[in-house]
Curated annotation (Swiss-Prot):
Keyword Secreted attached: no
Summary of the knockout phenotype: Promoted M.persicae aphid population development.
Family to which the UniProt record says this protein belongs: Belongs to the FLZ family.
The gene coding this protein: IRM1
Organism per entry: Arabidopsis thaliana
One Pfam family from the record: zf-FLZ
Listed GO CC annotations: cytoplasm; cytosol; nucleus
Protein name from the UniProt record: Protein INCREASED RESISTANCE TO MYZUS PERSICAE 1
Length: 113
């Protein structure tokens, strides 16, 4: 018996790739002026707008509301929760665990009719 080789049914290839259409990029002549702006020249770059929308949670600590400095470490928890210190982060984790635990215990109580 040879390790790593399996004998069994072969997988049949399908023709699904024929159904996919690709958009080919349009090539513009550089000698003619164009009103199309490149990604870097666009004044309203959606990536920049998106980044500025998400930067709001990086201004203050999610627990004590202390302002977060740019030159200091920021401790993250659950994606959009920023904390000024490891202690604040751990306090929030313990609070969330306590909420989850008490919510779980109360849901086990039987409902009386």
């Amino acid at each position: 018996m040879v390790l790593g080789k399996r004998h069994g049914s072969l997988i049949k290839r399908t023709t699904s790739m024929k159904m996919i259409t690709l958009d080919t990029p349009t090539i513009y002549d550089a000698s003619q002026p164009s009103d199309h702006l490149t990604f870097h020249q666009h004044p309203h770059n959606p990536m920049v707008v998106m980044a500025s929308n998400y930067d709001d949670f990086l201004k203050t600590c999610s627990l004590c509301n202390r302002s977060l400095c740019h030159h200091r470490d920021i401790y993250m928890y659950r994606g959009n929760n920023a904390f000024c210190s490891l202690e604040c982060r751990e306090k929030q984790i313990k609070l969330d665990e306590k909420k989850a635990k008490t919510g779980f215990v109360t849901s086990k109580k039987p409902i009386r009719i």
